[in-house]
Amino acid sequence: MTEQNKRHRAGFVNIIGNPNVGKSTLMNALVGEKLSIVTAKAQTTRHRIMGIVNGDDYQIVYSDTPGILKPNYRLQQSMMNFVDTAIGDADIILYVTDTVEKGDKNEEYIAKLKKIQCPVVLVINKIDISTQEQVLKLMKWWKEQLPEAIIFPASAQEKFNLDNIFDAIVGNLPVAPPWYDKDVFTDKNLRFFASEIVREKIFLNYKDEVPYSCEVEIEEFKEGAERYDISAVIYVMRDTQKGILIGKGGQSLKKVGTQARIEMEDFFQKKVFLRLFVKVDPDWRESKKELRRFGYEY
């Protein structure tokens, strides 16, 4: 091992917590790139997404995960498999809560954190919408629950206290060579981000069950000299959902396509020609075969 490798720190920092506490917003802020889609709806994140931050003597491999829930169907079970895997292979757990939720909501996972061998950094997010008294009370409560945890009040949205969180993470990384090349910033490819951008726009533009009944698959992804040609299929579970998604005269789907194309062009730094299609697949959330095709694990 070289002298530089003896000083180099690297490890997996896995982010877990309930839905809607700001895990994805926090990871995007820490990484400095929008890698995880963000909406106000719960269960927006379905996959485990890595964001990699490199320095001369460190590499942090952040991993955003779906919000903790009790699964009602096979898709949600796969989402929770991502969470359980993240707990098992972490060098540091970054547990995110906020000033709104009840601390004892996840007793099962809090019990796991008490037994875990790796460092736990606990972030109380959204302090910008709380009072100092409430934040201090929450910090005291969490310190009683997880005495070994390093606790930070923060606001991912306002980027408050992120420097201190970053310093604590780097200071607790194990000494190790980098896991990835230093010019890599995520483990996902552009096809994945194209599908996630479309799915985000669906979450932002529709309500009720429609966003949760949709999955996006990229059927064509071609890079030309001047633009990307992308064809995406949006799968829904019922014909009525297909009608809602398309909208009168196709206007609703056109809006989603326009918003997605604009964001893709910003993310890919190249022009995008995007085609959207809608198909009905009543069983995609329960079918192991379909879920594997969409990138979910079993």
Annotate each predicted stretch with a short phrase:
Residues E33, I52-D56, A86, A90-I93, ...:
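Conserved, well-folded catalytic cores of nucleic-acid-processing
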Residues P119, D128-T186:
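Canonical P-loop GTPase G-domain recognition
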Residues G22, N161, S252:
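Conserved glycine(s) of the Walker
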Residues T45, I68-K70, K102-G103, S130-T131, ...:
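Catalytic P-loop NTPase motifs of RecA-like helicase/translocase cores
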Residues M1-N81, T85-I87:
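Conserved G1/Walker A P-loop phosphate-binding module
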Residues L190-Y298:
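P-loop NTP-binding site
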Residues D64, N125, S155:
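Active-site glycine-centered loops adjacent to acidic/histidine catalytic or metal-binding residues
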Residues D57, N81-A149, K222-A225:
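Conserved C-terminal guanine-recognition region of P-loop GTPase G domains, centered on the G4
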